[in-house]
Amino acid sequence: MAALRALLPRVRAPLRPWLFCPVQRSFASSAAFEYIITAKKGRNSNVGLIQLNRPKALNALCNGLIVELNQALQAFEEDPAVGAIVLTGGEKVFAAGADIKEMQSLTFQNCYSGGFLSHWDQLTRVKKPVIAAVNGYALGGGCELAMMCDIIYAGEKAQFGQPEILIGTIPGAGGTQRLTRAVGKSLAMEMVLTGDRISAQDAKQAGLVSKIFPVETVVEEAIQCAEKIASNSKIVTAMAKESVNAAFEMTLAEGVKLEKKLFYSTFATEDRKEGMAAFVEKRKANFKDQ
């Protein structure tokens, strides 16, 4: 962990769980998580909230943390009451990267045959929208984790970076690909080749971050956005998310073709009928997720 801490300025205040009620779980196992905290938030308890909670290690993303994160994501994905998910860290650090101690003794054979980091991208397969609420440092794997989310809200003191080059390696969980798509080749290349960090303000200007808020309100703002998303039809929201994500994987012609198919598909749903009827009748739609 010394190598990890050497990449960061000194974090004086200890991390602590915040904005949480007592842990609420609807998972198959009754055992408490070790590395994360979960809760349902929002007036209708329709937002799943996950906090990375490994403060002594600056929320370094060890294998156990990723396993627990995937379990929580799956549970919220299967919960019919939850329409969106917020992922956050601590007040000083979102996540400072992968766990260097776990990586230090790995060999090429270990990584290749074992599919090292292959389970990190389960977040990208979640159909419900995921909002990252980032305070403090989102570096290395922490930055990659934030970029796997659908929306990034940042605290005004947040910093983003891919400093793997400084410890003799490169990003391995999508950093070179997602960062380039988000901010463009020149800035991504500079960040990856120098290990330099960018501020929340620079990240927003570059298109990596959607909005910036004061440190103490960023999580609550993300929850409010998630509540707004969760008030819509879950099935149509999933279609919209799939269509936007296709823009990063397909040509324009292919993406427009998929969009058209998904658009047509909404006409097979009861929620499309309800939404249009509510608009014509000048009332609020009552979606049933059907």
Curated annotation (Swiss-Prot):
Subcellular localization: Mitochondrion matrix
GO BP of this protein: fatty acid beta-oxidation
Catalytic activity: a (3S)-3-hydroxyacyl-CoA = a (2E)-enoyl-CoA + H2O; a (3E)-enoyl-CoA = a 4-saturated (2E)-enoyl-CoA; (3E)-hexenoyl-CoA = (2E)-hexenoyl-CoA; (3S)-3-hydroxybutanoyl-CoA = (2E)-butenoyl-CoA + H2O
A single GO cellular-component term on record: mitochondrion
GO MF term list: 3-hydroxypropionyl-CoA dehydratase activity; crotonyl-CoA hydratase activity; delta(3)-delta(2)-enoyl-CoA isomerase activity; enoyl-CoA hydratase activity
EC number of the protein: 4.2.1.17, 5.3.3.8
Modified residues (N6-acetyllysine): K101, K211
Residues reported to bind substrate: A98, D99, I100, K101, G141
Protein name according to UniProt: Enoyl-CoA hydratase, mitochondrial
Organism listed in the record: Bos taurus (Bovine)
